[in-house]
Amino acid sequence: GKGTAIYTLDMMDSLGIAHCGVYRNKEDRNRRYPLLIEKKGVRIALLNYTYGTNGREVPAPLIVNLIDKESIAEDIADAKCMNADVIIACMHWGDEYVSLPPQRIKELSRWLIEQGGFSTNDLSNFRFKNLSN
């Protein structure tokens, strides 16, 4: 619920732990997102999305980044405007207890690659696309 989410966000902030995907409100998301981390001169933009909240309503004013191509495209454009060298889109998606990703995941994966960023937090059988020029 809202109280648990706010507690978690407050705790992470107090410990200096960077986070993305859940926000206190729209202003919080606008200020913090995309999450840009710079290490050894490399600027990494982290994007984070989920398929849903397991049927639970997200109480206002909390924001959870849901998988939505239009929003993701806007976020990738924002990351590019921040001069990110690398864009990683962490996707909480897929079906449990299956060894191959469903077609909708394959299609979204291909679209993400075409947009410039792709990573997944779930190991499944997958194919690589060589993106080097």
Regions inferred by a protein language model and the residue ranges of each:
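Acidic, metal/ion-coordinating pockets
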Residues: 1-133
